[in-house]
UniProtKB/Swiss-Prot annotation:
Signal peptide (UniProt feature, chain positions): 1-26
Highest taxon listed in the record's lineage: Bacteria
This protein's name: D-(-)-3-hydroxybutyrate oligomer hydrolase
Function: Participates in the degradation of poly-3-hydroxybutyrate (PHB). It works downstream of poly(3-hydroxybutyrate) depolymerase, hydrolyzing D(-)-3-hydroxybutyrate oligomers of various length (3HB-oligomers) into 3HB-monomers.
Length: 709
């Protein structure tokens, strides 16, 4: 616990008074600040908080809210232009930036550390250091970054981790970093071996650490990601499969998720190095000393989604006492196989819980597009538009998916409507909460399950881009789905505009096994010429999870490398999760993890679980009322509760305040007309209670969790 940690300046003063004093002539054994051996390609920049800054890339609150992204002066974007756009895109991808949704009033750059909305732009002056973590081979090249605000308090030093969400690049945790910057904390980021910039195999160009592009030959070991093909293999691949792209998460061959905890811990180590280089005391020879250490610096591991899972992994794997506490939102955590925990809601036992992401996502990939046509979901966001787009007689791809599942014996109902209801029931039986059903149509329309299933199957299998696992590849396509060359304007900006997991920023999933020629997955046809949204590809991916052949064993072996233990080593932790989450369902992640942690740690467990009603995974979708009407009237911003969890953890570690008890926070939807919901108020988002009323209390015992309705 960080309370009573001795301030580094006091330690320095004590050391000065005890070393070399009294004329003893004794030699002083200085504790020099040593650069971690894995750091490569280190570079630093300073930002004045006026023309440019750490948090908003010089855009300020207003610029981040502007629907028009920053421009580029020429066809070859500069590193600074890419940085600014990456901050803009990633912030808006993770946060609702509409005023009606709370931006600028309840959260956002201009809302200070005490939650007060100011009239300023919220820009943060400071320094930014960025480097690779690698063994010198250039094959790993995980990006690490440390932002140190000028307001960093040397007397109360703190570090917050903000590991990237999803498969995003280094700025993919910037909304979490915002909390730390406002507190005067250093923020430790890592892309955890993922990232948005691809290897363009046809052009043989790659991105450098700053997003600018060059040839793979010139980049050498400085490439953020190189697919690692020999010249002969690259030529053969391009000849047989032209115009394809390789992405780091899918195609690095590293199974990066197994090291997400390590990458986060290395980001913290990098932060200590940067702090000591900048603020540490100096030896008589001018060398920086290890003034800031885990013993005197408060460190909170945080972030959301995959970044939240990385924070939990880091806390489990922390052998040096680097991390004091954890505060995360909707973490993706892979439970042990056959964890044997019990999850209850409202007194009813959840039959299926604790499955890994690749398992439940390949199940969603099979059934979600069909389930989205269920009549019981007709009033949910995007359901009507989904039916028009994907069940129209001219393009009945979702209805054909239902029929294809029936033909395979995976559904039994006779009509499309009944098949859709059956598909929905199968998802609910597989661990999705009933409230999650309202999100199936929009997630299916955005091809969320296929994108995750393809990337993670490749990653866990350590597949090469050459393997084209289950017949999938990545490419830019035309309006009718034909593979085409990726325009330089797309490739050169993907570092900023992409999310690292196609479909993204114009790059699509391609079905290389489509009848005739490879075509965009959505438009592809089976051997009989029927468009089924590539049911065969979905079944292939599913077989890697459930099968026993060599390909399945490879994936399953990689999956086992990513499973968590539940042992947070007694560290205090707060997990916040939206009950309605349809991407990372609570029954497979946060709920069973809390039960596992209590079984592993027993009375030493200090984990609080906060489940938020009317909250789901994609806050940014709330800010798209014209595209996704109904998100605004149904859902509140979960990001606000991550901020509150961080507030509570900081108060616990620094001031000794008790952690909030595990509970359900009952929010109030904005209501009104979908697409034009009234502005959110504080009444919609009640605080996390220090001690909830009995009806809201979550009971966690050894291997079991009971959540009230």
């Amino acid at each position: 616990m960080t309370v009573f940690k001795t301030a580094p300046l006091l330690i320095a003063a004590l050391a000065a008074s005890s070393c070399g004093g009294g004329g003893s002539g004794a030699a002083v054994d200085y504790d020099f600040n040593v650069r971690p051996s894995y750091l490569n390609d280190l570079r630093q920049a300073s930002y004045d908080g006026a023309g440019n800054d750490l948090l908003t890339g010089g855009l300020g609150r207003s610029g981040l809210q502007d629907d028009s992204p920053p421009g580029y002066a020429g066809s070859q974007p500069t590193a600074e232009e890419l940085r600014r756009n990456a901050i803009y895109v990633n912030y808006r991808a993770l946060v609702d930036t509409t005023s009606e949704g709370g931006y600028g009033r309840l959260y956002g750059p201009n809302v200070d550390a005490q939650g007060r909305a100011t009239s300023g732009e919220g820009m943060v002056a400071g320094t930014e250091a960025i480097a690779y973590s690698d063994d010198g081979s250039g094959r790993r090249n995980v990006t690490l970054m440390v932002q140190v605000p000028d307001a960093f308090d040397r007397t109360r030093p703190c570090i917050i981790t903000a590991t990237s969400s999803g498969s995003r690049g280094i700025y993919g945790g910037i909304p979490t970093g915002e909390w730390g910057l406002k507190r005067g904390c250093a923020v430790a980021y890592t892309d955890k071996g993922t990232g948005a910039a691809p290897h363009d195999l046809q052009a043989d160009t790659v991105a450098l650490i700053d997003g600018t592009r060059t040839s793979a030959t010139l980049a050498g070991t400085r490439a953020a990601f190189d697919a690692g093909l020999s010249a002969a293999d690259l030529a053969a691949f391009n000849g047989a499969t032209p115009q394809r792209l390789a992405f780091k998460h899918a195609h690095s061959g590293q199974n990066p998720e197994k090291d997400w905890g390590l990458s986060t811990l290395q980001a913290v180590e990098f932060a200590f190095y940067v702090l000591n280089e900048r603020f540490g005391d100096r030896s008589p020879g001018g060398q920086a000393l290890r003034t800031f250490t885990p013993a005197n610096t408060t460190v909170i591991a945080s972030s959301l989604s995959n970044g939240g899972g990385a924070a939990i992994a880091a806390a489990e794997q922390d052998t040096r006492g680097l991390i004091d506490g954890v505060a995360v939102s909707e973490p993706s955590v892979q439970m042990p196989a056959n964890a044997g925990v019990t999850v209850q809601r409202g007194g009813r036992t959840v039959a299926v819980n604790g499955l890994p992401l690749i398992d439940y996502t390949t199940q969603a990939h099979l059934y979600q597009a069909c389930a989205a046509l269920a009549p019981s979901l007709a009033s949910t966001p995007f359901a009507a538009a989904f039916a028009v787009r994907f069940a129209d007689p001219a393009f009945p791809v979702a209805a054909n998916r239902c029929a294809g599942l029936k033909a395979r014996g995976l559904l039994s109902a006779a009509t499309t409507a009944a098949q859709a209801e059956e598909a929905l029931a199968r998802l609910t039986a597989y661990g999705w909460e009933p409230e999650s059903g309202a999100l199936h149509a929009s997630l299916a329309a955005f091809e969320v399950a296929p994108s995750i299933a393809v990337t993670y199957a490749n990653a866990l299998s350590r597949a090469s881009v050459q393997d084209r696992l289950c017949g999938y590849s990545f490419a830019t396509t035309s309006a009718i789905g034909a593979v085409q060359p990726t325009p330089a304007a797309v490739t050169n900006t993907l570092f900023a505009t992409g999310n690292g997991i196609p479909p993204t920023a114009g790059v699509q999933l391609v079905n290389d096994r489509s009848r005739g020629v490879p075509v965009r997955d959505l438009f592809s046809s089976n051997a009989a010429g029927v468009p089924t949204w590539n049911l065969e590809g979905a079944l292939c991916l599913r077989s890697l999870v459930t099968g026993t052949d060599a390909a399945a064993r490879r994936l399953q072996s990689g999956l086992d490398e990513t499973r968590r233990t539940g042992n947070l080593q007694g560290k205090p932790a707060i997990i916040v999760h939206g009950r309605d989450d349809a991407l990372i369902p609570v029954n497979h992640t946060s709920r069973p993890y809390a039960a596992l942690n209590r079984r592993v740690e027993g009375a030493a467990s200090r984990l609080s679980y906060i489940e938020v009603t009317n909250a789901q995974h994609f806050d940014a979708f709330i800010g798209l009322p014209a595209t996704l009407p109904g998100y605004d009237s149904r859902y509140i911003p979960l990001h606000l509760y991550l901020n509150r969890a961080l507030d509570a953890m900081y108060a616990h570690l620094v001031n000794g305040e008790p952690l909030p008890a595990s509970q359900v926070v009952r929010t109030v939807p904005r209501g009104g007309t979908p697409g034009s919901a009234p502005a959110i108020t504080a009444a919609n988002v009640p605080p996390i209670a220090a001690m909830p009323v009995a009806a809201d209390a979550v009971a966690i015992t050894s291997g079991a969790i009971a959540v009230p309705d």
